């Protein structure tokens, strides 16, 4: 049976929601208790992160079989700039129904994030 465009859209939206909730739980388990999904309706407004509560980071979550990383990075950057809060754009991604989460961001943003961490100050056990 072939799916209609409407069915494909609903399936994609549901997969995205499941992925975002999975990422919320993974980040909370990692020690970030304030992470939550943003309110989304009729798609989402440009500049809105998929998740909030991870200080300094604009989260774009992708739960797909095949990810166009360049497109996802561009979307994350565009949305983070639209937010106007200076958060670092990052794409959190995983393969649908398998594996763990990965993070992609430009090297310059990673350096900025890392430089502000305790790891850069030599306190790796904190």
What is the role of each PLM region?
Residues 1-126:
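Catalytic phosphate/metal-binding cores of nucleic-acid and nucleotide-processing enzymes, i.e., regions
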């Amino acid at each position: 049976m072939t799916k209609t465009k409407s069915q494909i859209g609903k399936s994609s939206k549901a997969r995205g929601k499941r992925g975002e909730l999975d990422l919320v739980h993974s980040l909370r388990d990692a020690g970030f208790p304030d992470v939550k999904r943003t309110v989304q309706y009729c798609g989402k407004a440009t500049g809105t992160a998929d998740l909030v509560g991870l200080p300094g980071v604009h989260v774009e979550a992708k739960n797909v079989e095949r990810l166009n990383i360049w497109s996802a990075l561009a979307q994350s950057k565009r949305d983070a700039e639209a937010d106007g809060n200076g958060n670092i754009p990052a794409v959190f991604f995983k393969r649908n129904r398998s594996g763990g989460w990965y993070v992609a961001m430009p090297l310059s943003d990673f350096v900025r994030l890392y430089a502000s961490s305790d790891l850069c100050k030599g306190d790796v056990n904190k």
